[in-house]
Amino acid sequence: MTKRALISVSNKDGILEFAKELVALGYEILSTGGTKKMLQDNAVAVTAVDEVTKFPEILDGRVKTLNPMIHGGLLGKFDDDSHQAQMNEHGIEPIEIVCVNLYPFVETISKPNVTWDDAIENIDIGGPTMLRSAAKNHQYVTVIVDSNDYATVLEELKAGGATTIETRRKLAAKVFRHTAAYDSYISNYLTEEEFPESLTMTYELKQNLRYGENPHQKAAFYQKRLGSDFSLAYATQLHGKELSYNNIQDGNAALQIVKEFEMPAAVAVKHMNPCGVGTGVTLEEAFDKAYEADPTSIFGGIIALNMEVDAATAEKLSHIFLEIIIAPAFSQEALDILTKKKNIRLLTIPFEQAKQDQFNVVSVEGGLLVQEPDRYGFANADIKVVTDREPTKQEWEALQLGWSVVKHVKSNAIVVTDSQMTLGVGAGQMNRVGAAKIAFEQAGEKAKGAALASDAFFPMSDTVEAAAAAGITAIIQPGGSIKDQDSIDKANEYGITMIFTGVRHFKH
């Protein structure tokens, strides 16, 4: 009996050569629609599916292969006498190979002006059904959903007349991953609930990593197919070694901070916390400020810049050991300077597409925590000056800078700033005064006349007391403590201006 292969693909890459090889190996090709026409136009003998089903395509092609003559051939066990008897009774012949890929639903909904009707018409029904039938029966049927697998299948067919059970099992598993992902894109597109009763997310493997956070941990990097282009997952690497797990974590943290600024800005990150943030009239000035903020911790750090890197900035960057530099672009002169450093990684990301994902997702043992990103910045805050003294223009600028940075620092967080740069960062402390002391120690004499930003309210007035001792003259914090008045009174006592925002910025 002639072996049969059913081919129906929307992605025609490599399919003509694959079909010709199957014919040469003695397979009869079954096909439908555009695939059938393409094969026939290229002199490949094809049997139309409706010749097998004895039923025409109907409903504008919505029903083609949904027929027992097809699915019986896919699901029947080749070595089961009962199955074979039933197939013979109904004139059903087995199908040994299925090669199907699906309507381009994701590509369709990615178009800027896609209509609802276009999206719905690109939901494939017959394709996933055939794939699942063939994958279920992989003991006997070879199912292919990825053109990268054509060569492996042909190699095994030529060598032994059939594919191995190991290959068929791997291909079947790939099919079920593929159809599950396909369905998740559809369900997410159709879902209107913010937090539905079940949550299905699809990520595709971008790369295997050398190791995870530590050398004994295995790791890989997955990306969203419909994710934001403003992401390391879609960055273009111009130079350097492949990214590590920690590089990706730190790079992502740097990106989230630098996109807070419209003026030229530079952000240095170590262990997912900023060690230096600087702004300026030029990018070179912004980097100078970020470096000045903490010239020790920046060593081995990640730098994110929000403007094209020019030669002057690149020259200064080249004198420091840095893991990664991320920017919208690099001038040719800057590339010539920086690529002399063998190991530094240079990445570009389209800043004009800077946006956040719909949700932040955190894995916990046995589940996921899902929340909206913290999108509230200075412009969203309900600013209230709660002290007798109003901030000066320079203090307002320093407070705004501090508030833009502190939301990205691990809680409890205190950030000390002037109008252009961070002066001290107290991160991840179990009490607020402890975080403040770290920030003051780092700022040193520069804390005098500077501003302080706190990610959460002061439970008592001791942080204001410590700020006054360090020389701080302006404070920004959410407010909301039952002892707010104590902090206000203490600020007034020392002539400190203080504003409440009404917004907390915990970060764990």
UniProtKB/Swiss-Prot annotation:
Gene3D superfamilies: 3.40.140.20, Methylglyoxal synthase-like domain. Pfam families: AICARFT_IMPCHas, MGS. GO terms for biological process: 'de novo' IMP biosynthetic process. One of its GO terms (cellular component) is cytosol. Keywords: Hydrolase, Multifunctional enzyme, Purine biosynthesis, Transferase. GO terms for molecular function: IMP cyclohydrolase activity; phosphoribosylaminoimidazolecarboxamide formyltransferase activity. Transmembrane segments: none annotated. It catalyses: (6R)-10-formyltetrahydrofolate + 5-amino-1-(5-phospho-beta-D-ribosyl)imidazole-4-carboxamide = 5-formamido-1-(5-phospho-D-ribosyl)imidazole-4-carboxamide + (6S)-5,6,7,8-tetrahydrofolate; IMP + H2O = 5-formamido-1-(5-phospho-D-ribosyl)imidazole-4-carboxamide. Belongs to the PurH family. The IMP cyclohydrolase activity resides in the N-terminal region. This is Bifunctional purine biosynthesis protein PurH. It comes from Lysinibacillus sphaericus (strain C3-41). The gene is purH.
